[in-house]
């Protein structure tokens, strides 16, 4: 399994985290890419 940052979950080699924030799709995707993991909106 992937080593994930604290507070993140690993599943099939990828790290995931749920954020309960109200954002538009564009703002949410931007927020995800700004995370330390350089993620994407799923």
From Swiss-Prot:
Keywords on record: Calcium, Cell adhesion impairing toxin, Disulfide bond, Glycoprotein, Hemostasis impairing toxin, Platelet aggregation inhibiting toxin, Secreted, Toxin
Cystine bridges: 4-15
Needed co-factor(s): Ca(2+)
Transmembrane segments: none
Start and end residues of each C-type lectin domain: 1-42
Stated role: Binds to the platelet GPIb/IX/V receptor system and inhibits ristocetin-induced platelet aggregation in human platelet-rich plasma. Strongly inhibits platelet aggregation induced by ADP, calcium ionophore, thrombin and collagen. Does not inhibit U46619-induced platelet aggregation.
Homology family: Belongs to the snaclec family.
UniProt subunit comment: Heterodimer of subunits alpha and beta; disulfide-linked.
Full protein name: Snaclec lebecetin subunit alpha
Organism of provenance: Macrovipera lebetinus (Levantine viper)
């Amino acid at each position: 399994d992937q080593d994930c940052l604290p507070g993140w979950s690993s599943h099939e080699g990828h790290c995931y985290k749920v954020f309960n924030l109200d954002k538009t799709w564009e703002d949410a995707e931007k927020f995800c890419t700004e995370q330390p993991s350089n993620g994407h909106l799923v």
